[in-house]
Amino acid sequence: MSKSYDWSFNSAQKPNSKLMLWLYNQYVLDCPVKGVSARSCDFSTLGWSGHSYLTLASAMKSESNLANQTWRYVKDAELNSTLRELGVFNKYTLDKELCVYAKGDKQKVEGLFYMIRNALAHGSFRYHCTKTGEYLVMQTSRNGKLRGRAVIKIDTLKRWRSLLNNRRKYLK
């Protein structure tokens, strides 16, 4: 059985300073969600809008180990039950990547980038380095209410940022 961890971020391990700087630059300062960062180019400026969001979501899924079951964008009222259904409400493992977050006023891909940005900006993350890779575990909340949780490989986060800037490769 795989080791399980609590969703606790007090005194959680952080990545080395080089990786932390990259994460901060790519997902906080350069967050592509419109209106979130004055420094970034939003999705539409990068060429991702309309139907191309579906292509982006598909490309992101192919650049990760996420499946429909483990990349869930759910109503607020369904968040806790979805986390329970996946067996990650109280604890998580590093067996698979997962992203479960509440729908807000953003599309699925925007919501994911917004969740990652918020977890990094507010310190609700934990870094793991194992034989199978490096992982970033994240959680977001608003007014004390859980809004999302994710376990994502660092390599996946790097590939996602790369594909954002290479839309011509995916939109033919």
Q: Locations of the language-model features?
A:
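Amphipathic alpha-helical interface elements
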Residues: M1-G133, M138-K172
